[in-house]
Every structure is written in structure tokens, then in C-alpha cells.
Amino acid sequence: MKTRPAFSTLMVLTALAVASPPGAAQQFTRRAPIATVSAPVILDTAGLYLERAARVGEDMFVTGQPTERALRELKAQGVTTVVNLRTPEEMTRNVPFDEAALVASLGMQYVYLPVRGNDQFPYSPATLTKFADAVGNAKGKVLLHCTVAWRASHLWAAYLINRGIPVDSALANARAINLMDDHRMGSNGRQPVEDFLDKALPTLGHPPR
């Protein structure tokens, strides 16, 4: 019998997690811990993604904006859920096709979680919970994307930390994709990963303010 990578176990454990109680929208659900996560494999982006793309294990893709071709290829590779972190303005201004409609036409689940680090689209524990739920409910592989995989890397790191991966290991995994300690802060002068978790990470670099 073929042994599935660690991330497959991660998805099963997420599916078994207890749902958040009513009124807990601003709290993330604590799920069963996982022991390890595969190192990201950087993918060729030519004609497929904007800027950056990586596969983590066999079941997770963390990327920049995918093209129509990329979405069709991901469907063929077993992706069943697409999670988009870009805002409506970004999608309207910069994407020459209707992503939601294409994803639906391909028979995949579309999960829209726009984040930008402002009052309208904050980095929040609620987004982390919804992403974890999307992973847990996925019937196949998952694509998590934003514009250049920066926001997606922060959410991915928060997800790993919430699942029990040590902070330094989770940050290293996400940095290998496109997490950067730069000036684009979330609320309270924190990095997005910290706002997704609603806690400070002392080992995370913070640029001078």
C-alpha cells in the first residue's frame, strides 16, 4: 500500500476537528496537532502563476495568481478546492477572466477569503479558521493563492503553527515559498501571520517603524 505524505494526514485530522461554536468568529479552532510538514517544492511559474508557486507535500499548492491554464492543470492534478485571498478590486483590475466562474465550471470548490490588512479586509483569526475548515472539507488537493504568494505564505505559516508545527519550522517553510519580513504590516504593527494567530511571534523579524 502506498503511504500518503504527512499533509494527507493533516487534512484528515482537520476534517475530524470540532467546529467553532456560535459567536466564535474571531477565534481560530484548535485542531489536532501534526508532527511534520514537507518542505515546499518551488514550481515553474511560466504561463501559469504570477511571481511564485510551490507545492507542499502532495496535497497543497501555495501560489501567486493562477492563470486559466494553471487552474485547468491543477484540476487535472487532483485539486478540488481553490482558496483565493485577493480583494474584489484586485480581481477586477488585474485578472482577465472570472476565476470563480471558471473554478465552478471545472467542478472545484471556490473559497473566497479576501485579506489586505485594512479595516475592510483584515488579517484575522476568523480567516485562519475558515481556511482550516476549507482544508478539512476538501475532497482532494487544495490551492491557496493571493497575488504573489506573500499573503498566502503568511496564512500558510499561521495554519501550520495552529496545527502544532514549531514556530521556527513553520516560518521557514513559508519563507521558502514567499513569506518575507518586510514593511507590509497587519494591525497593531504586527506581521500578517501574527494577526491570523492573534499573538506575537518573538522570533519573527520586524522591520524598523
What are the roles of these predicted feature ranges?
Residues C146:
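Short cysteine clusters
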Residues W150-L155:
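Glycine-rich nucleophile elbow surrounding the catalytic serine of serine-hydrolase chemistry
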Residues S8-A19:
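Bacterial N-terminal signal peptides
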Residues M1-P5:
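Positively charged n-region of N-terminal signal peptides that target proteins for export
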Residues G23-V142, W156-R209:
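Cys-dependent protein tyrosine phosphatase-like superfamily
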